[in-house]
Curated annotation (Swiss-Prot):
Function (record text): Electron-transfer proteins that function in various electron transport systems in microorganisms. Functionally interchangeable with ferredoxin.
Name this protein carries in UniProt: Flavodoxin
Annotated ranges, domain Flavodoxin-like: 4-143
PANTHER family per the UniProt record, alphabetical: FLAVODOXIN 1, FLAVODOXIN 2
Homology family: Belongs to the flavodoxin family.
InterPro entries cross-referenced by the UniProt entry: Flav_short, Flavdoxin-like, Flavodoxin, Flavodoxin/NO_synth, Flavodoxin_CS, Flavoprotein-like_sf
Gene3D superfamilies assigned to the protein according to its UniProt record, in alphabetical order: 3.40.50.360
Keyword Flavoprotein: yes
Pfam families, per the entry: Flavodoxin_1 (PF00258)
Length: 146
Protein backbone atom coordinates (compact mmCIF):
# COMPACT_ATOMS: atom_id res chain seq x y z
CA UNK A 1 0.00 0.00 0.00
CA UNK A 2 1.50 3.37 -0.99
CA UNK A 3 2.14 5.85 1.81
CA UNK A 4 1.62 9.61 1.79
CA UNK A 5 2.88 12.20 4.25
CA UNK A 6 0.80 15.37 4.42
CA UNK A 7 2.42 18.26 6.28
CA UNK A 8 0.44 21.46 6.69
CA UNK A 9 0.87 24.92 8.19
CA UNK A 10 -2.42 26.59 8.99
CA UNK A 11 -3.36 29.73 10.91
CA UNK A 12 -7.11 30.01 10.35
CA UNK A 13 -7.79 26.30 9.86
CA UNK A 14 -8.45 26.35 6.10
CA UNK A 15 -5.19 24.66 5.10
CA UNK A 16 -5.60 22.11 7.88
CA UNK A 17 -9.09 21.33 6.57
CA UNK A 18 -7.71 20.87 3.06
CA UNK A 19 -5.00 18.53 4.39
CA UNK A 20 -7.63 16.42 6.17
CA UNK A 21 -9.85 16.33 3.06
CA UNK A 22 -6.92 15.21 0.91
CA UNK A 23 -6.08 12.48 3.42
CA UNK A 24 -9.69 11.28 3.50
CA UNK A 25 -9.76 10.98 -0.29
CA UNK A 26 -6.41 9.20 -0.47
CA UNK A 27 -7.41 6.82 2.35
CA UNK A 28 -10.68 5.96 0.63
CA UNK A 29 -8.71 4.98 -2.46
CA UNK A 30 -6.35 2.68 -0.55
CA UNK A 31 -3.43 4.94 0.28
CA UNK A 32 -2.08 5.05 3.81
CA UNK A 33 -1.73 8.66 4.99
CA UNK A 34 -0.06 10.47 7.84
CA UNK A 35 -1.23 14.04 8.45
CA UNK A 36 0.90 16.28 10.66
CA UNK A 37 1.00 19.92 11.64
CA UNK A 38 4.28 21.46 10.49
CA UNK A 39 4.81 22.74 14.05
CA UNK A 40 5.21 19.10 15.13
CA UNK A 41 7.93 18.04 12.66
CA UNK A 42 11.54 18.76 11.80
CA UNK A 43 13.13 18.47 8.39
CA UNK A 44 15.85 15.81 8.82
CA UNK A 45 14.64 12.61 7.18
CA UNK A 46 11.05 13.85 7.01
CA UNK A 47 10.23 12.16 3.68
CA UNK A 48 11.82 8.82 4.56
CA UNK A 49 9.44 5.88 4.17
CA UNK A 50 6.84 7.75 2.12
CA UNK A 51 5.98 7.39 -1.56
CA UNK A 52 4.66 10.94 -1.81
CA UNK A 53 4.99 14.05 0.35
CA UNK A 54 2.29 16.72 0.20
CA UNK A 55 3.13 20.12 1.66
CA UNK A 56 0.38 22.60 2.50
CA UNK A 57 0.96 26.19 3.50
CA UNK A 58 -1.17 29.30 3.65
CA UNK A 59 0.20 32.62 2.37
CA UNK A 60 0.30 35.86 4.32
CA UNK A 61 1.49 39.34 3.48
CA UNK A 62 0.63 41.91 0.85
CA UNK A 63 3.96 43.49 -0.10
CA UNK A 64 6.00 40.30 0.09
CA UNK A 65 5.39 36.57 0.27
CA UNK A 66 5.08 35.31 3.82
CA UNK A 67 4.80 31.62 4.60
CA UNK A 68 2.55 30.56 7.44
CA UNK A 69 4.61 31.22 10.58
CA UNK A 70 5.07 27.59 11.69
CA UNK A 71 6.13 26.54 8.18
CA UNK A 72 9.18 28.83 8.04
CA UNK A 73 11.61 26.55 9.99
CA UNK A 74 10.77 23.56 7.78
CA UNK A 75 11.12 25.64 4.62
CA UNK A 76 14.51 26.96 5.70
CA UNK A 77 15.74 23.41 6.42
CA UNK A 78 13.93 21.64 3.55
CA UNK A 79 17.23 20.48 2.03
CA UNK A 80 17.50 17.99 4.92
CA UNK A 81 14.02 16.50 4.41
CA UNK A 82 15.08 13.92 1.82
CA UNK A 83 13.03 15.20 -1.11
CA UNK A 84 15.53 14.22 -3.84
CA UNK A 85 13.79 11.82 -6.25
CA UNK A 86 10.65 11.96 -4.07
CA UNK A 87 7.18 12.68 -5.46
CA UNK A 88 5.94 15.95 -3.99
CA UNK A 89 2.75 17.99 -4.24
CA UNK A 90 2.11 21.46 -2.85
CA UNK A 91 -1.19 23.03 -1.84
CA UNK A 92 -2.31 26.09 0.03
CA UNK A 93 -4.92 28.69 0.74
CA UNK A 94 -4.71 32.37 -0.02
CA UNK A 95 -6.60 35.46 -1.10
CA UNK A 96 -6.52 36.48 -4.76
CA UNK A 97 -7.02 40.13 -3.84
CA UNK A 98 -3.39 40.19 -2.65
CA UNK A 99 -0.42 40.71 -4.94
CA UNK A 100 1.13 37.30 -4.23
CA UNK A 101 -1.87 34.96 -4.35
CA UNK A 102 -0.71 31.65 -2.83
CA UNK A 103 2.88 32.82 -3.15
CA UNK A 104 3.95 30.40 -0.42
CA UNK A 105 2.83 27.51 -2.64
CA UNK A 106 5.02 28.83 -5.47
CA UNK A 107 8.17 29.23 -3.36
CA UNK A 108 7.78 25.81 -1.69
CA UNK A 109 7.18 24.15 -5.06
CA UNK A 110 10.24 25.87 -6.55
CA UNK A 111 12.46 24.85 -3.65
CA UNK A 112 11.24 21.24 -3.76
CA UNK A 113 12.10 21.08 -7.48
CA UNK A 114 15.52 22.63 -6.84
CA UNK A 115 16.13 19.88 -4.27
CA UNK A 116 15.40 17.18 -6.87
CA UNK A 117 11.79 16.38 -6.08
CA UNK A 118 9.35 15.39 -8.83
CA UNK A 119 6.11 17.34 -8.77
CA UNK A 120 3.31 14.80 -8.75
CA UNK A 121 0.60 17.31 -9.71
CA UNK A 122 0.14 20.97 -10.50
CA UNK A 123 -0.09 22.94 -7.28
CA UNK A 124 -3.49 23.38 -5.66
CA UNK A 125 -4.16 27.05 -4.91
CA UNK A 126 -7.36 27.77 -3.05
CA UNK A 127 -8.86 31.25 -3.06
CA UNK A 128 -10.62 31.86 0.25
CA UNK A 129 -12.82 29.06 1.50
CA UNK A 130 -11.86 25.59 0.24
CA UNK A 131 -14.00 24.04 -2.50
CA UNK A 132 -14.44 20.34 -1.73
CA UNK A 133 -14.76 19.35 -5.40
CA UNK A 134 -11.50 21.12 -6.26
CA UNK A 135 -9.71 19.40 -3.37
CA UNK A 136 -11.17 16.00 -4.33
CA UNK A 137 -10.04 16.40 -7.95
CA UNK A 138 -6.52 17.35 -6.89
CA UNK A 139 -6.24 14.44 -4.46
CA UNK A 140 -7.34 12.05 -7.20
CA UNK A 141 -4.76 13.55 -9.57
CA UNK A 142 -2.07 12.92 -6.95
CA UNK A 143 -3.30 9.36 -6.44
CA UNK A 144 -3.20 8.63 -10.16
CA UNK A 145 0.46 9.62 -10.33
CA UNK A 146 1.85 7.80 -7.32
Amino acid sequence: MPKALIVYGSTTGNTEGVAEAIAKTLNSEGMETTVVNVADVTAPGLAEGYDVVLLGCSTWGDDEIELQEDFVPLYEDLDRAGLKDKKVGVFGCGDSSYTYFCGAVDVIEKKAEELGATLVASSLKIDGEPDSAEVLDWAREVLARV
